[in-house]
Amino acid sequence: MSGRESLRSAPPRQEVDLVTVERADWRDACRRALDGGERFCGAYAAGSGSRRRWNALFARGPRTRVLTTVFGEDGPPTIVDLTPAAEWDEREAHDLYGLRFRGHEPLRPLVAHPLDTPSWTVPVEGEGVYEVAVGPIHAGVIESGHFRFHVVGERILLVDLRLFYKHRGLERAAEGSELTDGLAFAQRACGACAAANSVAYALACESVLGLTPSRELRRARTLLLELERLYNHLNDIAAVCAGVGFAAGNMAFAALKERAMRLNESLAGHRFLFGSIEVGASRLDLPSPAVDRARGELHELREDAARAWREIRFSASVQARLDGVGVLDPDAAARLGAVGPVARASGLGLDTRAASPGLWYGSAFAAAVPPSAGGDVAARLEVRAIELGVTFEMLDELLAEPVGGDIASPGGPTAPVGVARVESPRGETVCVVEPDMHRVRRLRLRTASYANWPALAHATAGNLLPDFPLINKSFELCYACVDR
């Protein structure tokens, strides 16, 4: 698929429907959206006092429906029984905004960490059942996360995830800032997802401001997104190799990741692509010599990655450790709202790139679902390997001509709320911007990691405790994305 074909099939702007719902009709409205084939992709609170609002987002193709209801001092009814994917959204709103959801009580703390430990632990009792607590301080140089395993022998009954230890309040900090300045909060939420978060924020703001991204701007942003996907997928394959003790594969893909990040720095001036994206503009400016040099480096990188992948693919001992471990079946993946490579490895053809207005992708973009989408570690690894090939092809196409910084054109219709959905390396990132003139009234950033952490807990149950590090690495989720 050529870039021109992508541009013809991709709408230039996000399509958003804002629908006000009476409080008494809230559950019925959400049920109708789900029954109509729409997919829950986030919820958030806004407003204050008697004008407090609860909003739920549902997606279908390039269109996003925002259902909103005013509930005042009374809490809205829960929809977790309709879509379990909403559980974290409701628990977070309870902790940060004091919302009480009728039908979802008692609500275990998610963001808050009260000293009253029984208030947030899951009681599991039975003969031979005991707990293994891991974290939040770990032996490795990683961020803070607490995993409480309930096991019989070495078999995991369930794992309770406790994150948000270093929550920074970025969404609240962004309130009152200029729309153009608010991008810094989204960009710095997570280094590994900086480009995806920045593009999502920029597209949401441009929808509010009536700006339409130009051809060059769409191409530059897609280039940055694919560069980010490249080094993340290389890193994730290296991590799985480390999880099974395959040092040769770990070292090979870690070296490939380093080369990809050095390429980022040479093209964008930053290894994590910070500072390349603006609201209504792009700072990326690559003349012919730069793109030619980058294409050559990417060609070599692709050949070396294919060679390293063959070493993994034909290693019987590695494959034996991956098959059948950490299975996430399709029904659970859909029910829990899994996105990205995790969802595709479970057989769900879900890829936001096929429905990303304002970018280079189009409706002809096909999700990479492996032939044997068993939902296990092997399938999640294979999805990333397949997507590496797609990303290399996309990058070669995007760099076929010089890339110039360009701006979005004004004069388009403005929206009362800006919503953007962008496919990050880990899956769909959803950004909502509610404006107050040219300032941020409310920012909501729901990343793929936020969506996938509950799916990780589900995939872990029934496995052996020593296999958890491997399962965890096959998801490779961000802590910072939930600590935003």
What is each of the regions a protein language model found here?
Residues Y44-A45, A238-C241, L273-E278, A320-G324, ...:
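Short coil/turn segments at secondary-structure boundaries
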Residues E90, H94, S198-E206, L224, ...:
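Predominant activation on well-ordered alpha-helical scaffold segments within soluble catalytic domains
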Residues Y130, V134-G243, A252, E265, ...:
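Active-site- and interface-proximal helix/loop "cap" or "latch" segments in soluble metabolic
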